[in-house]
Amino acid sequence: MKNDKTILIIDDDSKNIFALNAVLKARKYDCVSANSAAVGLEMLKQNKNIAIVLMDMMMPEMDGYEAIRVMKNDEELKEIPVIAITAQAMTGDREKCLEAGADGYVSKPVDISELVKLLDLLI
């Protein structure tokens, strides 16, 4: 492991989770995943070893924007950094993610070197 901390991947698309998990584990990161924001928030409350969240922004029921707001308003969770991962790459989308409380932003398809730089910076 790069460290003793865990990355939580929250994405409703199992293919995205699988791909990120494979790439990050190959780089010696420890990963866990959730297929919805609600499940991810519950995992964050139960697993104190999660160091950072990779959050898909477009999910049904609770989207990434709302999930980040919930995290940032929770005393236990507000210090955990979040990297927004989204297919939305138009002008203003990055700013919208950061305004919601994300600490970083990566557009899909994910540039792994960019993601690793952010992880190293934020963990």
PLM regions and their residue ranges:
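Active-site beta3 strand of CheY-like receiver
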Residues: 48-54
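Alpha4 helix (beta4-alpha4-beta5 surface) of REC/receiver domains from two-component response regulators
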Residues: 66, 89-104, 117
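Active-site residues of response regulator receiver
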Residues: 56, 86
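Short amphipathic alpha-helix used as the core "switch/output" element in two-component signaling
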Residues: 42, 65-78
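C-terminal output helix
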Residues: 110-119
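Charged docking surfaces used in two-component/phosphorelay signaling
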Residues: 18-26
